Amino acid sequence: MNNPIPSNLKSEAKKAAKILREFTEITSRNGPDKIIPAHVIAKAKGLAVLSVIKAGFLVTARGGSGIVLARLPDGKWSAPSAIGIAGLGGGFEIGIEVSDLVIILNYDRAVEAFAKGGNLTLGGNFTVAVGPLGRNLEGNVSLRSSAAVFTYCKSRGLFAGISLEGSCLIERKETNRKFYCQDIRAYDILFGDVPQPAQAEDLYEILNSFTEKYETEGQRINLKKVAREQRKAKELPPKPSSRPQPAHPPVQLNAGSQGNRNEYKLYPELSSYHEKTGNLNQPIEVTALYSFEGQQPGDLNFQAGDRIIVISKTDSNFDWWEGKLRGQTGIFPANYVTMN
């Protein structure tokens, strides 16, 4: 395991890069389902990487060191700020254990709370959850978590559950002062007042790789969506072959059968719903099962799920009917809809 004893910021950045690789690369001990997904880090608003030592005898004490970074408005990562972690816990654990931690800050408010206050108590005002594992979890329901903080812990090379409730991330002001050669607060570091240091080049290289992996995964997912849409389009039912021909000019309906209303039929060869039933108060409404994009003038465009008012219809579902949607009137294939 890595050294939990506080050291200079250059060493902490080097340690953080090593820990991130161990948490995200597939090895003989880490299969594809045992790594931090690239998109979790790519979407993170902030990130803390630490080594922690835990000692227990009736009461457990936890302490360690590491760094924290924040995502800047331009999408780049800030310079690192040195941090420590401290906490107490109950239980009857006896012994000493060293662990590596990766803490994902999912919201800007979690980053701001640390940056402005110089410390952040986990589980206080922010919900903490064990982070998801596996590189193919982008669409997984479990990722729709509202947790402000994800935690990952490795002990003896294996992922392990760890409760960080009550643990506090603490700003190491003196370490930052020595590295940046000035009195500077975590707030200024995390909000971009100093450039990325060359001494942390290895760390930024691996952080940027997560964004590249995530974008590649996103492109692959989009290609799958396009392929699904193309397959779906090919599976659309065939449209009726013969189309009704519009009258020029439209034919006036029998005024007596329409309650003395002056209405006109654009497609007189289609039977009027009102003429057949005499029901003026309850027009037929159908719901689109498929999307239909008109290919000729007079076609009625609609999306799957749209509700269409039927103006004229035939007795066959494999035919063209006339309908009205969002103020537009036109004909559509009846086998693309279902009666409500």
UniProtKB/Swiss-Prot annotation:
Keyword Ligase found: no
Residues of the SH3 domain: 281-340
Matches recorded under InterPro entries: SH3-like_dom_sf, SH3_domain, SH3_domain_YSC84-like, SH3YL1_SH3, SYLF_SH3YL1-like, Ysc84_actin-binding
Coiled-coil ranges per UniProt: none
Tissue localization of expression: Expressed in skin, kidney, stomach, small intestine and colon. Highly expressed in the anagen hair follicle. In hair, it is expressed predominantly in the hair bulb, the hair shaft, inner root sheath, and outer root sheath in the lower half of the follicle.
GO MF entries: phosphatase binding; phosphatidylinositol binding
Ranges of compositional bias, category Pro residues: 238-249
Domain of life the protein comes from: Eukaryota
Keyword line: SH3 domain
Annotated family: Belongs to the SH3YL1 family.
Subunit record text: Interacts with SH3D19.
Protein name from the UniProt record: SH3 domain-containing YSC84-like protein 1
Source organism (scientific name): Mus musculus (Mouse)
